[in-house]
């Protein structure tokens, strides 16, 4: 490897999951109504192998996406809690769902952009000092996705 100037190591992982959501919009749109998608999430993580020889454990990614699968994803702005239920008030509607069927995200809306951001933040919580970059892409359909990239401080900075 005499001629090698640098090495970049990156892992890639992808998974589909089914979830429903609705959007807060100031204009009339079908997306204001509860609807679902078969999302596809793609994750790329750049870094160096840790003491176990991994940049990041794929099992953490699988468990994270399992929490979203077949759930209703809502913004924390729209909810209140009542005896094991989540009450969701939005767009002149009130939904009462068991807590186990809802994922409440700490974002102002439930767009693909904010879902990607939420996923990237959960990955960051489990990332070691060996991770340099986290990229998350969330596809709502075969034609459209949102992507976020987190560039992390180098070790010891």
From Swiss-Prot:
Pfam families (UniProt xref): PTPS
The EC code for this enzyme is 4.1.2.50
Cofactor(s) needed by this chain = Zn(2+)
Q: Which UniProt keywords apply?
A: Lyase, Metal-binding, Zinc
- Pathway assigned to this chain's UniProt record: Purine metabolism; 7-cyano-7-deazaguanine biosynthesis
- Which residues does the Swiss-Prot or TrEMBL record annotate as the active site? 31, 70, 140
Q: Which SUPFAM superfamilies match?
A: Tetrahydrobiopterin biosynthesis enzymes-like (SSF55620)
Q: Which domain of life is it from?
A: Archaea
Q: Which GO terms describe its molecular function?
A: 6-carboxytetrahydropterin synthase activity; metal ion binding
Which family does the UniProt entry place this protein in? Belongs to the PTPS family. QueD subfamily.
The name of this protein is Putative 6-carboxy-5,6,7,8-tetrahydropterin synthase
Lineage of producing organism: Archaea, Methanobacteriati, Methanobacteriota, Thermococci, Thermococcales
């Amino acid at each position: 490897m005499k001629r090698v100037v640098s090495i970049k190591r990156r892992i890639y992982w992808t998974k589909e999951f089914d979830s429903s959501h609705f959007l807060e919009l100031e204009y009339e749109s079908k997306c204001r109504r509860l609807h679902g998608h078969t999302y596809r999430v793609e994750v790329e993580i750049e870094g160096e192998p840790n003491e176990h020889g991994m940049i990041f454990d794929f099992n953490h990614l699988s468990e994270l996406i399992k929490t979203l699968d077949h759930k209703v994803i809502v913004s924390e702005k729209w909810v209140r809690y009542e005896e094991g239920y989540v009450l969701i008030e939005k767009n002149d509607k009130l939904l009462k769902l068991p807590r186990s069927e809802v994922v409440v995200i700490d974002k102002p809306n439930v767009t693909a952009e904010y879902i990607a951001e939420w996923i990237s933040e959960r990955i960051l919580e489990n990332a070691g000092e060996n991770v340099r970059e986290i990229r998350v892409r969330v596809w709502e359909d075969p034609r459209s996705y949102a992507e976020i990239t987190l560039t992390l401080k180098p070790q010891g900075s």
